[in-house]
Structure formats: C-alpha cells, structure tokens
C-alpha cells in the first residue's frame, strides 16, 4: 500500500466525533484538573494531541461535510445546517473510497447532513441533532427506504453500545472504518444522571473567563449584535434548566422580558407561588436581566422516573438561585452572568463525562480483541465552542474559541505517544490522511481533495510544510439564529485575518463600509485573547498588505467564487466543484 504500511495488514479506523467540543476542555487530559477525564487523558497519553487544529466552517453539518470530502464548503456544496440544499451524497468521499478499497464501513450516531448517508455498508444515525434521552435513529430498510426506530436510554450510552455491536458483528476478514458520532456536548446540555452531582462539585472550583464581560470594543461592530451571549441569549429554561414553577414573581420579573412575564401571569404560573402584587406597575417595570430566548426545555422525551431525577436536581438549582437573588447576591450584570455561566458549565461539562466513559469503553474493546495495535483512533470535535470567553457560547466565528477544534490521533507504534503537536492542521486533512494509511491514496482519489495527509507529522508532530501553513475559513449562515456575519479569512501561526462580508444595518443604509467593520486582523502573538482589531492600525499597514495577498492566493487556490460568501439576503448561486 502507500508509504505507511504494507498492503497485507491494512489498519482499521475508529473515528470518534463529538459535537461542539471546545479544545480548552482537552486540558482535562492533565491529571491535576478539577474535572479529571481518564478516557481523554489515556487517549492523549497514548496518542498525539494537535494544539493548532482548525475547522473550515464552524457549523456542525458543514464541518462534517469537510471531513468526509476533504474539501471546503463551497466545493462540497454544504454551506450551513438548515435552509439550503442537502449534502450531495453522489460526490467523492473517503468512506466511498475505503469501500472501493475493500474496507467495511459504518456510522452510528450523528450524521446531520440531511441526505441519506452514502459510502457505508450500514448506518444508524439521528434524523437531525438527536435527543439526549430516548433518541430516534434511522437506518436503511427494505427497498432502500429509510426506517425509524426509537431507542430507550441516554444517547451517549446508546451510541457507544451500537458502536461495540457494529464492531462485534462486522466481517472479521476485512479491515473496518467506523464513525462514532456523539451528540454531546451539543446544546441543550443534559448530563447523564450519574454525573449530575459530581460535575456540580467540579464546576464550583472553576473560575469564569476574565473576558466574560467583554464589551467588544476595538473589534468589528457585529460582535455587539451577536446573539450568543451567556448573559442575554441563553434561555432560563432550555439552556439553564431553571424550574419555572419554583420561581416567585419578585424574582421572575427580573429575569424574563415583560411580554413573557405577562404570558406567565395569564397562564397562572404564580397562582400557587405567592401570586402577583395587586399594585405592580407594569408600565414602569424594566427587568434587570431579561433573557431574550424563552422557549421550552428538553425533558420531554424522558420516562417519568428519569424525569424525576432531573427535576429534583434542577429544583435544587432553582431554589438556590431564588435564595441568592432574595439575599441580594445577584445585583449586577456580572453577578447574573457568572451564575448563568456556572449553570452552563455544569451541564456542558457534565455531558462530556459520558463521552469520556465512551472513549474508555471503546479503547478497552480494542484492547480486549487485539485490535489496538492496528487501529488508527481519531478523536475530533466538529468545531470549537465558546465557554464564556468574550461573554459567549456557541461558535460560527473565525475567532479562536470557535475556529480551533480538538484533534487527537492514536496509532500504536506509528504515531508518537504523548506529543503535543504545534503543526497547523485542518479538518479537510483527515480524509487524505485516512486514504494514505489505508493504501487508497490513488491520484484519482487524492485529486478530489484540498486537504493534505498528516502522516509526515506522525513521528514527531512537526514538519516544515505545517509550521506556518495558512488555513482558510468561511462562514455562510447569515441571516441565521445567532446573527453572525458572513465572513472568510485564514489563520497563520501568528495572525488571524478576515474579510467580513455582511454590512451592519447602518452600513447597508448608507452604502458605505467602515474599514474597521469590513476587515479583521488579530496579532495573536501580542494579543492572545483577541481583544484588538489592528486592521486599520498604521503600524500594521505592511502586514495588512501581506495578509490580503495571502487571502487572495488562498481564494484562488481553493477556487472560491468571486462573490462568495456574499453580502446579500441570500447566498449567491454557484456550482460546487469536485
């Protein structure tokens, strides 16, 4: 086969993908963290951690499309999660190429590309995001039809069990390639019951990010219009899991918008919880900390006994909040932001504890069956995620917390263990890497891809071609749920550069773009927390010229259409190229 291994002993592939996993949490690979994760730690100690690993489009579905195809979003056609065309399953992907090379291929868990999976001998995937409890799976049925079935249990455990079953029942005469797609730690975060109390204790030892109350000065104006604020955009119910029925009127009136409060009064929410003061002045009232989102919350798919466990836990959370509020401990916006951040961390990190157990279970299975020496294990998140840095949750931006993603690779005897690589790598690189180690890296296959194989990094974690490689990024989903602008750009070892295509409302009215809103340049060496846009700083004029030249070179190399990602109400029409 190719350059890595003889054709008589082709390696297996176990590709584990989580959803919205911040690489900052890979710090839990270290033994002295407040929240130890032995599965992640073992994987890091036995494999290589890539500290400068980036996505190409920080959204769940598009990132997965980039991994499958080895191509950027505009060249695989899947630009955003919803509202556009489904992933075109007829295009070249590495699972199809592995199939053709004699591999048995499968996927369990999250797919999130709308279309029916292709390139797999078997699949059991969520119809969309999946639910934390009793999720629905779909698989191929008679006459090529998709059939659905609901499984009972916690989603991470179910996906892990399906992965083990798939490996148990595979054709043992063939090498295998299995994708394990976990829902966790995607919103809305519901840890397994066994982790609720432990994670609360862990989070009590954590300190909020020092940028939690960022005012977004000195950066493009769109950051101030972003709708992913921990303080203002997290829902009290669906995200923070407060129990509405336990919050009395004197507290509730400060944490929801006035329109939502009126609706609660009309529905009699406070009837058995102190009622509403007869002299309450609706006209004069202005809530202190009104969450903009007030949709329902996700305990709907649980069995009654399971729901009771969560209700007991979240009842306690709500009771403690009401007591703190009435005791005057929630006076400022920072006070409220820290509380919402702490609830967020309890739930987000709690979901990762089950993923950690899944990793241990899967690695133990490989050990027991003599597969560890000849199986490449890849662990990735589909992108990064804000954990309160700059006051945000979610992703979408070219800023570091969103753009950078976890990547760990383990292949015993082939990949140096315990190394933290500083190479500049991207998720479009996984497909060509997998093809090379499988001996399927024919010119016909590799020529469809824009990524490069990472095998030169396997020995030491470093190679000249990866030292300061510029990594292209593009985000298309505008208008969208969180109001992030369309933008594209790239990251080098030192600089983050972007062209923000979407004008602000004022710029759209005037027809004039302000340079500080249109262009972004961050000097990550001098400004590692990315607090200052120096695009218009005269001291960086020459750097800006260099960055714009690299930007246009990258757009040319990757055949980005001239008007893409565009600045109008719709994405420009263009034909993906592969």
Where are these regions (language model features)?
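Residues forming the ATP-binding cleft of Hanks-type serine/threonine protein kinase domains
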Residues: 525
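Formylglycine-dependent sulfatase
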Residues: 1-519, 528-549, 553-556, 562-578
């Amino acid at each position: 086969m190719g350059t890595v291994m003889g054709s008589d002993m082709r390696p297996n592939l176990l590709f584990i993908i989580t959803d919205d996993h911040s690489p900052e949490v890979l710090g839990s690979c270290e033994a002295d963290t407040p929240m130890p994760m032995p599965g992640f730690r073992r994987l890091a100690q036995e494999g290589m951690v890539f500290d400068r690993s980036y996505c190409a489009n920080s959204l769940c579905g598009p990132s997965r499309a980039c991994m499958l195809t080895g191509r950027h979003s505009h060249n695989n056609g899947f630009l955003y999660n919803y509202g556009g065309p489904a992933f075109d399953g007829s295009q070249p992907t590495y699972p199809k190429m592995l199939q053709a090379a004699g591999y048995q291929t499968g996927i369990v868990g999250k797919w999130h590309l709308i279309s029916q999976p292709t390139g797999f001998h078997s699949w059991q995937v969520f119809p969309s995001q999946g639910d934390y409890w009793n999720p629905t799976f779909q698989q191929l049925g008679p006459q090529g039809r998709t059939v659905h079935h609901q499984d009972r249990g916690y989603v991470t455990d179910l996906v892990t069990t399906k992965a083990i079953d798939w490996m148990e029942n595979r054709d043992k005469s063939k090498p295998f390639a299995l994708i394990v797609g976990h829902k966790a730690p995607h919103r809305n975060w519901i840890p397994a019951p066994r982790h609720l109390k432990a994670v609360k204790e862990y989070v009590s030892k954590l300190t909020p990010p020092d940028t939690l109350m960022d005012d977004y000065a000195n950066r493009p104006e769109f950051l101030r219009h972003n709708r992913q604020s921990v303080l203002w955009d997290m829902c009290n119910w669906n995200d923070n899991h407060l129990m509405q029925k336990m919050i009395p009127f004197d507290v509730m009136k400060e944490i929801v918008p006035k329109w939502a409060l009126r609706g609660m009064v009309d529905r009699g929410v406070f009837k058995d919880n102190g009622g509403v003061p007869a002299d309450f002045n609706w006209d004069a009232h202005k809530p202190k900390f009104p969450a903009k989102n007030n949709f329902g919350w996700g305990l709907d798919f649980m069995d009654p006994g399971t729901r009771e466990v969560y209700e007991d836990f979240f009842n306690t959370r709500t009771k403690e909040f009401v007591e703190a509020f009435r005791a005057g401990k929630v006076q400022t916006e920072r006070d409220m932001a820290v509380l919402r951040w702490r609830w967020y961390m309890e739930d987000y990190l709690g979901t990762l504890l089950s993923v950690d157990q899944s990793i241990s279970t899967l690695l133990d299975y490989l050990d027991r069956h003599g597969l560890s020496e000849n199986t490449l294990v890849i662990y990735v998140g589909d992108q990064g995620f804000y954990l309160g840095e700059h006051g945000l949750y979610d992703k979408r931006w070219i800023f570091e917390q969103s753009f950078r993603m976890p990547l760990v690779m383990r292949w015993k005897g082939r990949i140096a263990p315990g190394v933290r690589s500083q190479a500049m790598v991207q998720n479009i690189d996984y497909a060509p890497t997998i093809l090379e180690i499988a001996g399927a890296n024919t010119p016909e296959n590799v020529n469809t891809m824009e990524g490069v194989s990472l095998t030169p990094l396997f020995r030491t974690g470093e190679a000249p071609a990866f030292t300061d490689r510029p990594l292209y990024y593009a985000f298309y989903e505008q208008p969208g749920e969180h109001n992030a602008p369309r933008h594209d750009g790239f990251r080098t070892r030192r600089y983050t550069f972007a062209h923000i295509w979407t004008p602000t409302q004022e710029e759209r009215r005037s027809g004039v773009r302000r340079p500080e809103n249109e262009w972004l340049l961050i000097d990550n060496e001098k400004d590692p927390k990315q607090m200052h846009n120096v695009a218009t700083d005269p001291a960086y004029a020459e750097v800006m010229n260099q960055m714009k030249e690299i930007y246009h070179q990258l757009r040319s190399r990757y055949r980005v259409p001239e008007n893409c990602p565009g600045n109008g109400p719709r994405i420009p029409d263009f034909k993906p190229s592969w």
